[in-house]
Design a protein with these regions (language model features):
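N-terminal accessory/capping or targeting/presequence segment of soluble
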Residues: 2-110, 123, 127-273
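Acidic beta-strand-to-loop metal/phosphate-binding motif
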Residues: 114-121, 279
Length: 279
């Protein structure tokens, strides 16, 4: 059974390399992340687990044309050794001097004029620009437009879309109207025209809403865009069950706060359309 799993892992790595070769990508990075930098991620976002077979909550995989590595911390050394055993993936123990760091590995393995790929939706700007600066001496380009693991993950679970529900103000402390007013005051002080939100816990707090899109975390997949006059909440609209008591309460609460609901998938294109705004 274990041998079969390891063979499947090596097959997946081979499939990924085929796509990398087609696109001219020399190394592909797969973090443990969703679109919101959540500490824990839903099943849809477990690309690193799918690719490597390692199911710890922290770790980053890098695949090149002839090497495959997983970086994780001391909490997971024993587990990772067991789950990677028999595959071609090497465990790089973070914090131990005999193992290169992720940065050191990329500096060494990427060729001059090479290309590093990753899904830019799950890599934050700090890491992305850091990698760009790290590799600029080798004139390495970044391709952040491809979810290559998603392309080979034919049985990928659907993105979670559990019902959203409203938290009573007696538990929330302040109404959404009050919280938006406080936020807009802070925006004025900082001369910000637009406030973008991507962290799920912060969005749930601001709008006094809760969900169950990540196990044991009362959050829902969402973004928010706030101006002095408007507030937009981006969610999967199917998560607001308007024909149920719970859904009607959500709609009423958002209407009271003059919050407009938009489709989750529209957020990135709306942000791309922003021009000359101070965020």
């Amino acid at each position: 059974m274990k041998e079969e799993i390891m063979n499947q892992t090596n097959v997946k790595i081979g499939q990924l390399r085929d796509r990398m070769k087609e696109l001219g990508i020399d190394a592909y990075l797969v973090p443990t992340a969703d679109f919101h930098e959540s500490e824990y991620v839903g099943e849809f976002f477990k690309c690193r687990h799918f690719l490597t077979g390692f199911n710890g909550t922290a770790g980053t995989a890098v695949i090149t044309m002839d090497k495959a590595g997983l970086w994780t911390d001391g909490r997971y050394f024993v587990q990772a050794e067991e789950q990677l055993s028999g595959s071609e993936i090497k465990l790089y123990r973070m914090g131990e001097p005999e193992f290169p760091t992720l940065d050191e590995f990329l500096e060494e393995e990427l060729p001059v004029d090479g290309c590093l790929g990753f899904d830019g939706r799950v890599v934050n700007s700090e890491l992305g620009y850091g990698l760009q600066n790290l590799l600029q001496e080798k004139n390495v380009t970044i391709n952040c437009s491809k979810d290559l693991v998603g392309e080979i993950w034919t049985s990928r679970p659907a993105m979670s879309c559990e019902p959203i529900w409203s938290l009573d103000v007696k538990y929330a402390g302040k109404s959404t109207v009050e919280k938006l007013s406080d936020l807009r005051d802070a925006m004025k002080k900082n001369k910000a025209q637009i406030h973008l939100m991507t962290a799920l816990d912060e969005i749930a707090w601001l709008f006094n809403l809760r969900g169950n899109d990540i196990v044991n975390n009362p959050v829902f997949l969402s973004y928010a865009l706030i101006t002095q006059d408007e507030a937009y909440l981006y969610v999967q609209k199917e998560a607001i069950k308007e024909d149920t008591k719970m859904g009607k309460e959500v709609c009423a609460a958002l209407a009271e706060a003059k919050v407009q609901v938009k489709e989750y998938a529209e957020f990135l294109q709306d942000v791309a359309a922003l021009k000359n705004a101070v965020c």
